[in-house]
Amino acid sequence: MLRSTLSNWREYLTPVTHQSTFENTGQITPEEFIKAGDYLCHMFPTWRWNQQQGGMVYRDFLPQDRQFLVTRKVPSNMRAADSVNVGGEEETSAGEYWVLQPQQESADGGEEIDIDEMLQEMDIEDQSGEQDIIQLRPSHTRFYDLYITYSTSYRVPKMYLVGFNNDGTPLTPQQMFQDIAPDYRTKTATIEKLPFFKSAVVAVSIHPCRHANVMRVLMEKVRAAKQKPVEEEQPDGPREDWEDLQDEVDSSLRVDQYLVVFLKFITSVTPGIEHDYTMEGW
């Protein structure tokens, strides 16, 4: 918790800057954070801004209804260690401390539902003359409330995770760490209290120290790809994730698209949590 306390003091003492350096550094201003948050909420309605209410700690450089973004009850059906190298695909490095993991298909991604597998999750007892009794086996599914706020010390978004068992009981920090990729549990994950609530809500935060560098590297790759002649034939072979992103933007990454890309990288740290990160919002 000492690291968390020092981080909070650094956030408090660091002055806020309003000069945009997005294209050169990958950092954003509070105004750009708001613009990116509005875009995220518009394209992905599961995300929304906070509501003004009692019991909150407000930061004066952000509007009271734009303090943080939240999405609730995001499912996690497998632990992080179980989802590493799914399908034997090779990991792609994207800067120090960041790895792009293979993406899981969403429920509406065209994958067929295995009815037999669903039935195996249930024990059905048929008792004649009595109502059928369906007993559900314990589920390994967990749910997360995800929060995104603005880090003044790193000038990038910062993610907080608050987890629950399938019966609604809160997860312990140790349990939440099971949903952090093993390589990052000691590098980027920290136990903290949510800074925007007066009451103590224990969360796991994803440290933002590398966020700006990852975004900057991504933007450089997009720019380099755009400078190549359009008619140049693409080489055969596997494509990197950043190349897929490059195909979906017009000329370069816009600042309002920042959080969509941010969530795509967060999946490297929390591969088992089913973020609403698809690129349909581009």
UniProtKB/Swiss-Prot annotation:
Q: Identify the catalytic residues.
A: C209 (glycyl thioester intermediate)
Q: Per UniProt, which keywords does this protein have?
A: Autophagy, Cytoplasm, Protein transport, Transport, Ubl conjugation pathway
Query: Mind telling me which GO cellular component terms the entry cites?
Result: cytosol; mitochondrion; phagophore; phagophore assembly site
Kindly list the GO molecular function terms attached to this UniProt entry. Answer: Atg8-family conjugating enzyme activity; Atg8-family ligase activity
Q: Where is this region: Handle region?
A: 213-257
Claim: Plastid is one of the keywords in the record: no
Q: Which domain of life is it from?
A: Eukaryota
Region Disordered, as annotated, extends over 225-245
Localization of this protein:
Cytoplasm
Q: Which InterPro entries match?
A: Atg3/Atg10 (IPR007135)
Where is this chain primarily localised? Answer: cytoplasm
Could you tell me which residues belong to the region Flexible region?
83-138
Q: What is recorded about the domains? A: The N-terminal region is involved in phosphatidylethanolamine-binding and is required for ATG8-PE conjugation. The flexible region (FR) is required for ATG7-binding.
Q: Which PANTHER family would you find in this protein's record?
A: UBIQUITIN-LIKE-CONJUGATING ENZYME ATG3
Entry's family note: Belongs to the ATG3 family.
Name of the protein? Autophagy-related protein 3
Lineage of the species this protein comes from: Eukaryota, Fungi, Dikarya, Ascomycota, Saccharomycotina
Please name the gene that encodes this protein. ATG3
